[in-house]
Amino acid sequence: MNALYVTTVPKGYSSLSKCNHNEQDTAYRLWLCTHNHWTAPSGMRLQPLTSLGSKEMKSRWNWGSITCIICFTCVGSQLSMSSSKASNFSGPLQLYQRGIGHITNSYKRPQAPAWPCLSSGTMGRSH
């Protein structure tokens, strides 16, 4: 799969507020030229969008993407928790923190088995 990374724009096209319909058509034609490996029409000067190289741009793009994904995941989970019944959960920990109850462990460890002959002192002796 071939990917197209646009790293240059025609001079004067860097500001979106200046774009009008004709400029968008020209930019589209320029994109078609670069996409089909043709040469740009004469009179169009291309200037780089940034002084960074392609590896640096890809690296920054990846870090930005990951940061956005993490932020949206965190915000989404917070919104989900605040709008769900899970936020009204009244388990033992929440009751303890509110001073309503106390945490108890219902599991009881079985007693350790008694060692045979431990009290008579014969353990480990041979007869």
Curated annotation (Swiss-Prot):
<keyword id="KW-1003">Cell membrane</keyword>
<feature type="topological domain" description="Cytoplasmic">
    <location>
        <begin position="85"/>
        <end position="127"/>
    </location>
</feature>
<keyword id="KW-1133">Transmembrane helix</keyword>
<dbReference type="GO" id="GO:0010506">
    <property type="term" value="P:regulation of autophagy"/>
</dbReference>
<feature type="transmembrane region" description="Helical">
    <location>
        <begin position="66"/>
        <end position="84"/>
    </location>
</feature>
<keyword id="KW-0812">Transmembrane</keyword>
<dbReference type="GO" id="GO:0001568">
    <property type="term" value="P:blood vessel development"/>
</dbReference>
<comment type="function">
    <text>Dual receptor for both endothelin-1 and the signal sequence of vascular endothelial growth factor A. Does not act as a receptor for angiotensin-2. Does not bind the VEGFA mature protein. May play a role in angiogenesis with a significant role in cardiovascular and neural development.</text>
</comment>
<dbReference type="GO" id="GO:0004962">
    <property type="term" value="F:endothelin receptor activity"/>
</dbReference>
<dbReference type="GO" id="GO:0005886">
    <property type="term" value="C:plasma membrane"/>
</dbReference>
<dbReference type="GO" id="GO:0021766">
    <property type="term" value="P:hippocampus development"/>
</dbReference>
<dbReference type="GO" id="GO:0038085">
    <property type="term" value="F:vascular endothelial growth factor binding"/>
</dbReference>
<keyword id="KW-0675">Receptor</keyword>
<protein>
    <recommendedName>
        <fullName>Dual endothelin-1/VEGF signal peptide receptor</fullName>
    </recommendedName>
</protein>
<dbReference type="GO" id="GO:0016020">
    <property type="term" value="C:membrane"/>
</dbReference>
<dbReference type="GO" id="GO:0007611">
    <property type="term" value="P:learning or memory"/>
</dbReference>
<keyword id="KW-0472">Membrane</keyword>
<feature type="topological domain" description="Extracellular">
    <location>
        <begin position="1"/>
        <end position="65"/>
    </location>
</feature>
<dbReference type="GO" id="GO:0005021">
    <property type="term" value="F:vascular endothelial growth factor receptor activity"/>
</dbReference>
